[in-house]
A protein has these predicted regions:
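Active-site-adjacent betaalpha module
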Residues: 2-38, 71-75, 79-80, 92, ...
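A short alpha/beta connector and helix-capping loop motif
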Residues: 37, 53-84
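Acidic-leg catalytic submotif of subtilisin-like serine proteases
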Residues: 38-48
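Generic enzyme active-site microenvironment
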Residues: 41, 87, 173
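Short active-site-proximal "capping" loops at secondary-structure junctions
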Residues: 46-47, 84, 90-93
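Short acidic, glycine/proline-rich loop/turn micro-motifs
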Residues: 51-56, 183-185
């Protein structure tokens, strides 16, 4: 009897546990952030403030308090002895302000990388592509990520999507992120707040659970029965 030859993509087997929407099945109380949780800061570099590069002649950003919120979370994670991880961007683009060879490639004040931190250097949007970020996180037993940084719709979004796809329990803190206006193909100038809000709406409930800075600091000390974990796409 000739063995059966299978060609092309085979359908995924559907089990009873998969008969419920992932969003429904996996939602629930968010438990306390502990040693399995890392704060991941994306590209907190001086070059993000060169607004005309990112948003054109009318360049402007949203959320001017993002850095102060990030600093408070950073201090809280360090105080609790939890893992801190950074991505730093060294652009392939000659005109980008995010190049290590330029002063604008340096970290913003207060976000200096410490010897005990995880830090990866990247030249694409995702912190997981071309780096050993996932390996370093897994080695430390990290299963949950709290993601903050720049820009909401670029490297933050790409890294958050990949984190969710890689199986991390992923939390995005929109108040600790920011972006700039974007110029569309037709020349339309899309406001930074609109770009930011739409990005968060796309990510929340699919690739991550979006929470506030206050939620994060509270979760460092206790479970949060009032919050729902709504990450799908798992």
């Amino acid at each position: 009897m000739q063995p059966q030859v299978k060609t092309g993509c085979q359908p995924r087997e559907i089990h009873a546990e998969n008969s419920v929407s992932p969003l429904t099945r996996l939602s629930g109380v968010i438990t306390q952030f502990s040693s399995d949780t890392a704060l991941l800061l994306i590209d907190v570099q001086k070059g993000v403030d060169v607004l005309e590069h990112w948003g054109g002649p009318t360049g402007r950003r949203n959320n001017p308090d993002a850095e102060s919120h990030m600093l408070r979370l950073l201090a809280a994670f360090r105080q609790h002895g939890l893992t801190v991880a950074y991505t730093r961007h060294d652009s392939r683009e000659a005109v980008s302000p995010l190049k290590f060879s330029l002063p604008t490639g340096a970290q913003k004040e207060g976000f200096e990388v410490q010897p005990t931190d995880i830090c990866v250097e990247k030249d694409v949007n995702s912190g997981f592509v071309g780096t050993d970020l996932e390996i370093q996180l897994r080695r430390k037993g990290i299963k949950r990520l709290v993601i903050v940084g720049f820009f909401t719709n670029m490297c933050v979004e790409t890294t958050t999507r990949m984190a969710g796809n890689l199986g991390f329990d992923t939390y995005l803190v929109p108040d600790c992120c920011a972006t700039t206006n974007r110029i569309g193909l037709d020349g339309a100038d899309y406001d930074a707040e609109l770009v930011h809000d739409m990005t968060v709406a796309n990510l929340h409930g699919e690739f991550c659970t979006a929470i506030t800075p206050g939620d994060v600091t509270a979760l460092l000390d206790a479970d949060a029965p009032q919050l729902d974990r709504v990450q799908g796409n798992e």
